[in-house]
Amino acid sequence: MRRKQFQMSRVAFPLSVKTNGKEKRVAREAWKFDHLYAHQDIYTVTYDNPKNLQADKDTALTHVTVDMIQFKQGTVRQYVFNKQRGQWMLTAIDEHALSSATDKDFLAFYQKFATNTDYQHSHITNPFEFKTYDYDTFQELEGILDAAQWVDYCPDMPTGLMVNIRYGEAQPQSKFRALAIISISAGMGCTMEFRRQSKGWMLTRLEN
């Protein structure tokens, strides 16, 4: 949505905009161009079901949310998209506190995991599954690594601002999360898988 004319054609006016539960309707003439996450090089995708890891390729998909998560401010600006008559439309914007987010439990865990090394190391299963690619032979390499080796493969994780995409409806009660971290400029990414166990959320797999 980098072009104003295109963006205007893909907003369902009057647009529902909620701020901490209070709703207003924004008319077409009052709409201001929104860059969304166009200026962000890194974004993430969250999956809460192992069967949905290819959801971005699902042509039957009709619902997507994009969350602009400000961890320091403790806020979320959520853009809601729905497919209507074959076209993706922005149908709502919902600004709310991070503490009231649908996936607040996992997000609170992720914030600590991404910023606290000791906490991070205590939430990695030992051993953990690992998958990578040999770009010389184009072969997949899979195995297991000792938790002590995590430091050699730990990806850079968004901390202050996280732009997160979710395909389909959220399943906050699911005990599975996969978090894909994607760099637009590098054209590369990695995926971390977590499962909720007796100790809380634990990293169980890394695909790099």
Regions found by a protein language model. Name each.
Residues 7-12, 120-128:
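Surface-exposed patches in mature extracellular/periplasmic domains of secreted proteins
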Residues 72-100, 187-208:
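Short beta-strand edge/turn micro-motifs at domain boundaries
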Residues 84-122, 129-141:
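Surface-exposed beta-loop interaction hotspot
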